[in-house]
């Protein structure tokens, strides 16, 4: 789209943040400069892996249509943060593996990656109604526990995301 559809609106933010079936939300990064576009772009990959969730970076007409001066960007000199990943050796040490068990209490569960060489590495998840072992369930208590876990994960995500920028202290008018 061009013109009015490219201007950021509250509806864009709400649609992106709550883009899903059911009661869930997703982190959204809103860059305010070309430097932040670059930085948030590569941070989004790490955060999406760590949180095991879609993470969105929204740009708008102002950033996309104007010419900006910027210092050369520095690429990260660290490996990608894959988050809580169990390999075959870790699975062998565990008594059992439940894909959606919140071991650490932060809402982010340990996971395996495709190709992990261990018989307990694979799992199948059907929909949002599942128990800790990824088995399908429509039981209210199971769904309530899952929603509570997702709420803990989203709350913890706030500490991982870039902080808000507040400028113009003492101003009579604020723009959000």
Q: What is each of the regions a protein language model found here?
A:
Residues 1, 30, 176:
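A short, small-residue-rich loop immediately preceding and capping a beta-strand
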Residues 1, 33-35, 61-64:
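Acidic, glycine-rich active-site loops and adjacent beta-strand->loop/helix elements
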Residues 1-23, 76, 80:
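Flexible glycine/proline-rich, aromatic-decorated loop/lid segments
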Residues 9-12, 25, 157-162:
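Glycine-rich, flexible loop/turn motifs
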Residues 23-46:
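Active-site/ligand-binding-proximal alpha/beta "capping" segment
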Residues 40, 45-176:
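Flexible, low-complexity linker and terminal segments
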């Amino acid at each position: 789209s061009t013109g009015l559809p490219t201007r950021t609106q509250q509806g864009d933010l709400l649609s992106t943040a709550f883009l899903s079936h059911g009661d869930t939300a997703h982190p959204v990064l809103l860059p305010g400069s070309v430097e932040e576009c670059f930085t948030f772009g590569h941070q989004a990959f790490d955060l999406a892996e760590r949180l095991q969730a879609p993470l969105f970076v929204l740009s708008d007409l102002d950033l996309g249509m104007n010419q900006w001066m910027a210092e050369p960007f520095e690429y990260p000199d660290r490996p990608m943060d894959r988050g809580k990943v169990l390999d075959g050796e870790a699975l062998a040490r565990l008594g059992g593996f439940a894909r959606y068990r919140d071991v650490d209490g932060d809402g982010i569960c340990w996971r395996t990656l495709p190709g992990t060489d261990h018989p307990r590495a694979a799992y199948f998840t059907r929909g949002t109604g599942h128990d800790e072992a990824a088995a399908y369930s429509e039981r209210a208590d199971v769904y309530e526990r899952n929603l509570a876990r997702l709420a803990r994960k989203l709350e913890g995500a706030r500490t991982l995301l870039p902080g808000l920028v507040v400028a113009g202290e003492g101003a009579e008018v604020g723009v959000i």
